[in-house]
């Protein structure tokens, strides 16, 4: 199958790899021939909610590699990033950035930074936010807080099924 873009970028902390992360990564591999994944450094996540519970970089890298391998994806490069923009504002050959509806504004910031450096803005490929069984977005913060699992299921449900709500 022909890919729409030669080189795409996607980035994140990818802590406790959940359905939202997986949808984002799948979209990146669907549209890009080569996928550049910016994985946040340990230093960068210190101010996130429940930061003390965020898995170390090496653990998150291992989980990411396992997901990529299980899905048979090839043609990728994982790069440790130390800022929100990472390398996306300086890599001339990138064509698109894959984000969720929630992180769309970040893509606009990347494009502004690229334009300031004389680079072409990236096409923005957006996926919808993946919801948990309770209707909230699936997020690593909720998983770290012990409220949901990586599939969006509540961990302390008092009732028959979340779908009964």
UniProtKB/Swiss-Prot annotation:
It is found in: Cytoplasm. GO terms for biological process: coenzyme A biosynthetic process. It holds the Pfam family CTP_transf_like. Reversibly transfers an adenylyl group from ATP to 4'-phosphopantetheine, yielding dephospho-CoA (dPCoA) and pyrophosphate. This is Phosphopantetheine adenylyltransferase. It comes from the Archaea. Keywords: ATP-binding, Coenzyme A biosynthesis, Cytoplasm, Nucleotide-binding, Nucleotidyltransferase, Transferase. Signal peptide: none annotated. The keyword Transmembrane does not apply. Disruption phenotype: Disruption of the gene results in CoA auxotrophy. One of its GO terms (molecular function) is dephospho-CoA kinase activity. InterPro entries: CoaD_Thcocales (IPR054937), Cyt_trans-like (IPR004821), PPAT_arch (IPR023540), Rossmann-like_a/b/a_fold (IPR014729). The keyword Membrane does not apply. GO terms for cellular component: cytoplasm. Pathway: Cofactor biosynthesis; coenzyme A biosynthesis. Belongs to the eukaryotic CoaD family.
């Amino acid at each position: 199958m022909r890919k729409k873009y030669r080189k795409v970028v996607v980035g994140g902390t990818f802590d406790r790899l959940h359905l939202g992360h997986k949808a984002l990564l799948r979209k990146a591999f669907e549209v890009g021939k080569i996928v550049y994944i910016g994985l946040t450094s340990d230093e960068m996540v210190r101010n996130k909610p429940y930061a003390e519970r965020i898995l170390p970089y090496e653990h998150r890298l291992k989980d990411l590699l396992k997901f990529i391998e299980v899905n048979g994806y090839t043609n990728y490069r994982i790069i440790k990033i130390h800022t929100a923009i990472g390398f996306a504002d300086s890599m001339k050959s990138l064509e698109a950035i894959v984000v969720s509806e929630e992180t769309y504004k970040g893509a606009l910031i990347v494009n502004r930074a690229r334009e300031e450096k004389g680079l072409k803005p990236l096409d923005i490929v957006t996926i919808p936010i993946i919801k948990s069984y309770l209707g909230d977005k699936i997020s690593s913060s909720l998983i770290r807080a012990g409220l949901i699992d990586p599939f969006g299921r509540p961990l302390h449900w008092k009732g028959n099924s979340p779908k009964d709500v």
